[in-house]
Structure formats: structure tokens, C-alpha cells
Regions:
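Structured alpha/beta or helical-core interaction and ligand-binding surfaces enriched in interleaved
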Residues: 1-143, 151-154
Length: 154
């Protein structure tokens, strides 16, 4: 336990460890080309601190495009051409980040760009540069029996 951990953070950490951590790690391992273990995740305190400093919103939206979910080559081409720095250090965020913690990754090359629709249950994957200069949101969904992917860069 971190000395600065609040009761609410401790509750989330313990609840997340029991209820979400195994599935969270499984999702991360499907989405990345590296093996992810629980000790690689940021603490709840550090995760909260990092996320509190993020101020991306519709006013800071730099780029948005909707593509077919299956077109992973186009996804990678767009992201490579629009992001400031593909090789920067990023934080990866999935649905249960508040209970399990952010995952620091060395760059976007470790991401499995050929991921499957069911690899992330909520349909949202977020990458935030560790220097907080940029955020990439991959939001995928099904509509009228077709699968789409929204790419948003802030």
C-alpha cells in the first residue's frame, strides 16, 4: 500500500484486484506484443495523479476519422502519419484503469495493430503520451451489422 493512498483508492485497488485484474491483464496481453504482468501496471495513486493532469476534450481534438474496423493497414497508416511521435513513451488505458492502473509502454510499436474486435470488451483503447502532449483514442463499435473504428487524436 502506498502511504498516500486514500481509503477510496484502496477500496478500488482491492476490488479491482479481485474482480477485474485477471481479465484486464488478459486483454492487455491480447492487445500488446509484449507480456504484461500486474507489477508492470502503475499504482492506483499514480494512475489517478496522471489522469487528473490530462485535459484533452473536444476543443483539443486534432484529427478524427471513421474507418472500417477490418482495415488495420489504414488504421496504422493514419496513426503513423498524424501522431507527433510514434516512438514516444505512452500510457495505455482500458476500461478498468481506475481499478487496475495504467500501463506504461515504450512506444506504439508494441501494440498489436491487428487486434480483434473482442480483444477489448468495452470497445475503447486509449494511448496517452507520458509527457501528456498527445492522446490517441481508438473507439470501435458495431452498427447495422458492420464494424467501425473511430480514430481520434487530441
Amino acid at each position: 500500500m502506498n502511504n498516500n493512498e486514500t481509503y477510496e483508492q484502496k477500496r478500488r485497488r482491492l476490488f479491482g484486484k479481485v474482480n477485474f485484474l485477471p481479465a484486464y491483464l488478459q486483454q492487455l496481453n491480447k492487445l500488446l506484443n509484449i507480456e504484461v504482468t500486474a507489477d508492470m501496471l502503475l499504482s492506483i495513486v499514480k494512475t489517478d495523479s496522471f489522469l487528473e493532469q490530462i485535459d484533452f476534450d473536444s476543443d483539443t481534438l486534432f484529427y478524427k476519422e471513421t474507418i472500417s474496423f477490418e482495415d488495420k493497414e489504414k488504421l496504422q497508416r493514419i496513426v503513423r502519419s498524424k501522431l507527433l511521435d510514434w516512438n514516444a513513451n505512452y500510457m495505455m488505458e482500458l476500461t478498468n484503469v481506475k481499478e487496475c492502473g495504467l500501463l506504461p509502454i515504450p512506444n506504439l510499436s508494441v501494440f498489436n495493430w491487428d487486434f480483434k474486435y473482442e480483444d477489448e470488451k468495452s470497445g475503447i483503447i486509449v494511448f496517452i503520451r507520458q509527457d501528456k502532449k498527445e492522446e490517441l483514442v481508438l473507439d470501435f463499435y458495431e452498427e447495422d451489422f458492420q464494424y467501425f473504428l473511430d480514430i481520434e487524436i487530441y
